[in-house]
Every structure is written in structure tokens, then in C-alpha cells.
Amino acid sequence: MPMLRLYARVLQLLGKEAMLGWVLAGANLLLAAAQFAEPVLFGRIVDVLSGNLSTGAMAQPAQSPWPLLLAWAVFGLFTIGCGAAVALHADRLAHRQRQAILTDYFEHVLQLPLTYHTGTHSGRLMKVMLNGTDALWRLWLGFFREHFAALMSLVVLLPLSIYINWRLALLLFALCVVFTVLTTLVVRKTYAMQGEVEESYSDLSARASDALGNIALVQSFVRIDAEVQGLRFVADRLLAMQMPVLSWWALVTVITRASTTITVLAIFTVGIALHEQGLTSVGEIVMFVSFATMLIQKLEQVVGFVNSVFMEAPRLQEFVNVLDAVPAVRDRLDAIDPGRLSGLVEFDNVSFSYDGKRPAIEDLSFTALPGQTIALVGATGAGKSTAIALLHRAFDPQSGVIKIDGMDVRGLTLAGLRRNIGVVFQEALLFDRTIADNLRVGKPDATEEEMRIAASRAQALDFIERSELKFDTNAGERGRMLSGGERQRLSIARALLKDPPILILDEATSALDAVTEAKVNLALDEVMKGRTTFVIAHRLSTIRHATRILVFDNGRVIESGSFDELLARRGYFAELAHAQFMVQDSARSAMPAAQPEGIPEF
């Protein structure tokens, strides 16, 4: 995205603060005009005191300097007051809008599909959020507090100086041209280079986050030195890329400062020559020297502004790219909140593909009545998880219809749909908050008694009560203060607390020991009564009592029936059962006490 368009997008992100932005822009224009009153009045006072008449448009008879001094004081007070008001409101605008856009970004990212998050490192998204909002804050603050006034000063100065003395004004105009050409060349030279620098910053953030997120692996495999060396390599590469960019902008700074001396000398030289010919006055020479000094100052601010926009551009581009990412699913304009559903689920010729080439789900049709338990089995990548993801609209199918209680799920609000579905993931997902906070994800207004009941039914109450802080115990980052079994039992309790009509169990008992698994299965059997339950299973022992089992292979259901019916068919499901030693050749109904070690799970 070109830099001007990118900055226009930055101003567009002002949102509700845009009106205040226009007010500040008008105030900056008045401030710019008032600032140039000082050198004009100063020059007039010099002419009055020296007895010389100004020339050209400023030619007037000599007069008392006191009215000029009074006008100078009035303009000075106005400049101070207006500048303070602009700075105060610019600060407030920038701070308020930074928090607003940060919240909008966070909400937007949470709505992006799981496929987006799978392909994007969470550390990178955090870095983009924090760096992007900080960059916006700096640009908004600088633009409305200083840089816009500097731009307006240039707009005011050039016509004003031409009006006073066009010959001396040509020197100021030449200075502006030199600055514009120089800055444009440097920006073009270094724009792509700065983009590579920012990409390295993202790599640095992602690598550090990756190492910290796997600290147990790093320490147990003695990888500390290797990870530090890897980070140092990325940092060194970043520094090597950044140095040429800094060198170019340092050159601009040097030339800017050198131009101050050159311009002032040129004005004095040309001014003296014009004065000898009677084409200018001493006051006008002094006035234009002040103009030149102010012009250099304003140009430095403008160059600083361009430099800051340039340096922030890659960060802003990343930020805008995330904001422009489109969620896979959205509420339709006519979407309705269905309230509490009964749990009648229908898949009618549903097909879906992630890449548009290989189908992940193809012509899937089945009906689950309220209270039934539907198990989905098959090899990894067969389409089980995709089918369930379509049910709660992580994606929408390319063809076919999914209905709940006879209503197309695409006609329901996402919040209304997902409020009716409880999920227990294979990997227990917990926040770095208290146990109570994690449980209330399922029901925000849950009482402690309700949490105790849910925890008890999930076999989690015992370990919660053993803790000194009980439900106020912090679970740690991603629940790391708890064991795997404890985390999973809390996630089950959370789903029970939600009390949804539709329940999804993604190998929900895989992290539990045999004794606890048996207890939790008994609790789940009781809880699943009256609910439509979908069980994604790899261990076939967990789905023996399912109402129906759907056997997936390459996105299709190749077998369907009860546990015993599928065994009797001696098909693919029976092969899976044999592989897990769930049945014996002589008696298919006999179940082993435990799965032997070394037998792979499917």
C-alpha cells in the first residue's frame, strides 16, 4: 500500500474522534498564521526604529512602535493559548482512540477463523496489536500537536513571503524544493529496506514467544544456549538491516542543519544587494531571516513527520492487514437468536474444502435426534473434526445445509448458536485466571454452589477443595499450575456448567487416568441424557454405548451403525477394533481391561 494511502487510512481510523480532529486542524491553521505575525511585526518595528520605509506591499509611512508591540503581545498570547489547547486535546484524542482501536483490533482477531490463528503465531498477533496501536498513537499525537501546524505554516509562509518581497521569497521557495526532493529520494531509497526491518522484528518477537511458550522443552533438552544463539542471530540480522536506513536519515538531518546556515547567508547576501538598490528594507531583511529560521524549523518537523510515518509504515501495514482480514463466518443481517434449542441436528449433503481442491467433507448426511449420542471415528484427517467445526460454524460449507431444530445454522446469530453448544476439547484450554473464572466461562453468572455441583459431577471437586484457595486458585498460564487430568476435568465441569442442549466431546477423557476416566464417563453418561452429544473418538472403548457411530474416511462416511452392528459387519470399524485389541477373535463382545502398550491409536 502506498504511504500516502496508508496514512489516509491512519486518519480514517480516528473514527468518532474525527470531528475533534477537524477542529484541531482548524486551530492549527490559525496557529500557523499567528506564528508568522511575530517576524512580520519584528521587521516593521526595526523599520520604524531605523526610520527606513518598507518596500513593496509593506510600504507604509513610519509610525509609533507601541501599537506594533501591543499587536505582537496579543499574537504571542494567542499563540501560547492556542498551542496549549491544541496540545491538550491532541493528547486526549490520541490516548482515547488508541484504547478504542486496540479494543476493536482485539475483538476482530477473536472473530477470525481458527485456520487464521493456526497459520499465524500468537506472539506475532500480539506484537502487531501493541506496536500498531503505539504507532497510531504517536502519529495522531504528532500530527495534531506539531506536524499539521508545521504543514500549515508552509502553506501560510510561501504566499505571505511572496506578498512581502517576491525576490527574497524565491530563496525560501528554493529551500522547500531542495527539502522535498531530498526527502522523496531518501523515502524511495529506504522504504523497502524498512519493510524488511519490520519483518525481522516480527521474526524476533515470534521466536522469543515460541521459546518462552516451550520453556519446559528448552530446559529439559538443554536448549537454552541454542535458543539464545538463534535469537541473537535474528537480532544481528535486524541490526544489519536497520543501519543503512538510519544512515540515510542521518544524512537528511545533516543536510537540514547545514541548510540553515546557507539559507541565512543567502538571504543576507541577496538582501544587502537589494537594499543597496532600494528594493528592500533592513526590517524586511530581518523579517526574512526570521522566516528562514522558522522555515528550517518547520521543515525539520515535516521531515521528522515523514520519517516517523516512514518508520512506522511497515508496522501500520501489518496492523491494517490484520484488520482487513475477513472472518470466515459472519452474522447475516436477518440472523436471529434462537433462544434455547432442543438439539435436533441435521446434515444434508454437506461438502467443504479448505483449499477448494481436496474435499475435507463430501456429501455428508445424517440426523441426530435430541438426546442421541453420535460418535465420529476414523483416521487422523478423515474429516471428523471438520464436520464438528461446521456444526458450530467455525466455517460454512460450500454446499449442503446444516440445520438445528429445522433452522439453517447460517440464519442464526453466532452467539445464539454457540450458546447452545458446549465443547470439551482434546487439549484442555484454560485462562491464566482463577478456577472460578475459568468455570464461569461456561456460565458467567454461576454461583459457587453451581460451580461445586458441576465440579463434583466432573470429578474435579476433590482436587479443588484440597487447594488452600479452593475456587480462587490460579490455574496458571494455559492451566500449567494444574496436572493434565485436572485441567481436563475443569474443562468438563465448564461444559457441564454451561448446560447446553448440544455437547461436543473431543476425546474428552484422553488425559485422565483409568480410575478417574471411569468415574468421569459415568458422570458424562448421566449428563448426556436429554442432550444431543457428538463424540470424536480415537479410543473406541469410549464410544461403546453411542447411539450411532459414523466411520469417516477421506471426508466421507463409509460405515454407520451401533457398536455391535459395525463389529458384525467385519468392515473398516471392525479392523480398527481389532487393531486396538478391543475384541477377541473367539468372542467379539469381550472387552480387555486395558489397552496394551505400544498399540497405536486411531
From Swiss-Prot:
It is a multi-pass membrane protein. Its main location: membrane. Residues 21-311 form the ABC transmembrane type-1 domain. The chain crosses the membrane at residues 22-42, 68-88, 146-166, 167-187, 238-258, 285-305. ATP binds at residues 378-385. The keyword Cell membrane applies. Its EC number is 7.5.2.3. It is found in: Cell inner membrane. Residues 345-579 form the ABC transporter domain. GO terms for cellular component: plasma membrane. Homodimer. NCBIfam families: PRK13657.1. Involved in Beta-(1-->2)glucan export. Transmembrane domains (TMD) form a pore in the inner membrane and the ATP-binding domain (NBD) is responsible for energy generation. This is Beta-(1-->2)glucan export ATP-binding/permease protein NdvA. It comes from Rhodopseudomonas palustris (strain BisA53). The lineage of its organism: Bacteria, Pseudomonadati, Pseudomonadota, Alphaproteobacteria, Hyphomicrobiales.
